[in-house]
Regions:
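Alpha-helical structural signal in soluble globular domains
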Residues: 45, 49, 136, 174, ...
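A short alpha-helix capping/helix-coil boundary motif
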Residues: 21-23, 45, 57, 111-113, ...
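Short, solvent-exposed turn/loop segments enriched in Gly/Ser/Thr/Pro and often Arg
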Residues: 61-66, 148-150, 185-194, 214, ...
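Active-site-proximal, glycine-rich beta->alpha crossover segments in alpha/beta enzymes
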Residues: 74-138, 144-158
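Active-site and substrate-binding clefts of carbohydrate-active enzymes
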Residues: 2-57, 62-105, 224-529
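Gly/Pro-rich turn-and-neighbor structural signature
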Residues: 125-135, 154, 159-162, 166-169, ...
Length: 529
């Protein structure tokens, strides 16, 4: 009989990036890389485990923005073309390296890898990854949860409760339409919680959410079991805390598994290493270089001297690390089991899904090895979801978590500082305007309704926490600033045209086609009160 429960949570999210006005757009690569490196590999792992009847339970967030992009015909057409290019590059690399015994093996590995992904995308999954994830949920292997509609950071939106409610309500409705049931839980974007938000979750029949460790350990009154059991908020929604130990083993840049010298080096790619004339057809149309996914070196060490990558050695190391993770969880549960007053401890191990495959190429191999080892090599603990835990332990302590996030510093530092604070006065102003529009136009006519619905979309897209995060980290700042301003300006124009009664239907149709997220939205989700 097991004495512990491990809840693995994979948070899959990307901001809504769709540019039909350009034939090729660099930031769309975020999606294409994530499909090739994370979503397809994870699906193949989960399907293989299911077909071999290996028991497993994993929680996975599929955010509304990500689901929308994965179901968009234009983006899936473009991704299919990207796979064709990668397969062509694989064939060229096999020819280029034919006389090099080391790199020839790697070229063959990548050619077979991308051809396998292309076959899975087109033949196995029929270009519909969301339905593939849904089948795994319907079969009882995954528990898919939702997230704020556009990943808005709720603690910085609480000045307008209607805006918070809209982020949650739109997401919950989107989930019902996509998966045919209520969302059992929610990943609050960035684990961003503030006291009171749970009432909006309860209204949508959402039963649980996740917070960082201090979101539970610093709750009032102090929880008896620390981060190893959920607490109920006053609204009856359960809060689960991240376990710091299991997170550190994977996330830590200094001590985590992904830094092992055997693993693939993320920052060496032939898109940067090879002659420009050779690689030009596979990089940006401007001739600017970018990653291709063909990475021939392993981490090796902290210097620039890198040794060739060995996929088989890396796969074996992933299995070793899976065994180490298993051993550490067994010892953790053995230590906890006598300290919980009869309550089964639950260790919550949440990660960005993109860590598994994108940042850590071997991550899907690690996860598959871990799931197999949990199923067959031990009896100390089992894999669960939060829903499973609540069924087994329906009575839990009632407490109020503090405002918290899982970002650096644990609060709102990443999304509110000198690099991005300028956005909030505009976001708050537009949110108040949206509430007022809903009050003043409670039953709008067809054209006005379209404009009001699009105004709601533009506001939601402007609220994405990704833009403030990018401004803070300094990666693609110009794009993040541009997107924020574009959505705010579109909202303001729509607001003014609605108020003035002179809606430009041609322009409205244009932006409806460009930002086509949430076609089912009803602007009255912003109704006052």
């Amino acid at each position: 009989m097991s004495i512990g429960s491990l809840a693995i949570v994979l948070h899959a999210h990307l901001p809504f990036v769709r540019h039909p006005e350009y034939p090729d757009f660099l930031e769309e690569d975020w999606l294409y890389e994530a499909i090739s490196e994370t979503y397809l590999p994870l699906l193949l792992v989960f399907d293989r485990l299911a077909e071999e009847q290996v028991p497993f339970r994993v929680t996975m967030t599929l955010t509304p923005t990500l689901v929308t992009m994965l179901r968009d015909e234009l983006l899936m057409d473009r991704y299919g073309h990207r796979l064709d290019l990668l397969c062509e590059l694989g064939a060229r690399e096999v020819h280029r390296t034919r006389n090099d015994p080391v790199f020839s093996r790697l070229a063959h590995f990548y050619r077979e890898h991308f051809e396998s992904l292309r076959g899975a995308f087109r033949e196995r999954y029929k270009r519909d990854l969301v339905s593939a994830f849904r089948r795994l949920q319907d079969a009882g292997h995954l528990e898919i949860i939702t997230c704020n509609a556009t990943h808005g950071f709720l603690p910085l939106m609480q000045q307008t409760p209607e805006a918070v409610r809209a982020q949650i309500s739109v997401a919950a409705n989107h989930y019902r339409l996509t998966f045919g049931r209520d969302a059992p839980g929610i990943w609050l974007a960035e684990c961003g919680y503030y006291p009171g938000v749970e009432k909006f979750l309860a209204a949508e029949r959402i039963r649980y959410f996740f917070v960082d460790t201090h979101g539970v350990t610093d709750a009032t009154p102090r929880p008896l079991h620390g981060p190893f059991a959920p607490i109920y908020t006053e609204a009856g929604v359960a809060a689960y805390a991240r376990d710091p130990e299991s997170s550190q083993q994977v996330w830590s840049s200094q001590h985590g598994y992904p830094g092992d010298p055997t693993y693939r080096e993320f920052y060496r790619d032939i898109g940067w290493d090879l002659e420009l004339d050779y690689i030009r057809p596979f990089i940006q149309p401007t001739g600017d270089r970018k990653n291709t996914g063909f990475k021939y070196y392993r981490i090796t060490g902290k210097t620039q001297d890198k040794q060739p990558y060995d996929p088989e050695a890396a796969r074996q190391q992933a299995a070793v690390h899976a065994g180490n993770f298993l051993f550490n969880r067994e010892k953790q549960f053995e230590w906890l089991s006598g300290k919980m007053g009869g309550r089964t401890p639950v260790v919550v191990a949440p990660y960005d899904a993109e860590l598994y495959g994108h940042w850590w190429f071997e991550g899907p191999w690690f996860l598959e090895a871990l799931i197999r080892k949990v199923a067959f090599d031990q009896k100390t603990f089992r894999l669960v979801t939060a829903s499973d835990d609540l069924v087994e332990h329906p009575e839990n302590q009632v407490a109020t978590p503090p405002l918290s996030s899982w970002g650096a510093g644990g609060y709102a530092n990443m999304w509110l500082d000198g690099s991005n604070d300028w956005v909030y006065r505009h976001l708050h102003h537009c949110a108040r305007q949206m509430v007022a529009l809903t009050k003043d136009f409670p039953d709008a006519s067809t054209l006005h309704r379209r404009a009001l619905n699009q105004a709601a979309r533009e506001l939601l897209l402007a609220q994405s926490s990704d833009w403030a995060f990018i401004m803070k980290t300094g990666t693609m700042v110009d794009y993040a600033v541009r997107r924020t301003k574009e959505h705010l300006l579109r909202f303001q124009r729509l607001h003014d045209e609605i108020r003035g009664g002179n809606i430009d239907e041609g322009w409205l149709a244009h932006i409806e086609g460009k930002n086509n997220i949430f076609p089912e939205i009803d602007y009255r989700v912003y109704r006052p009160g």
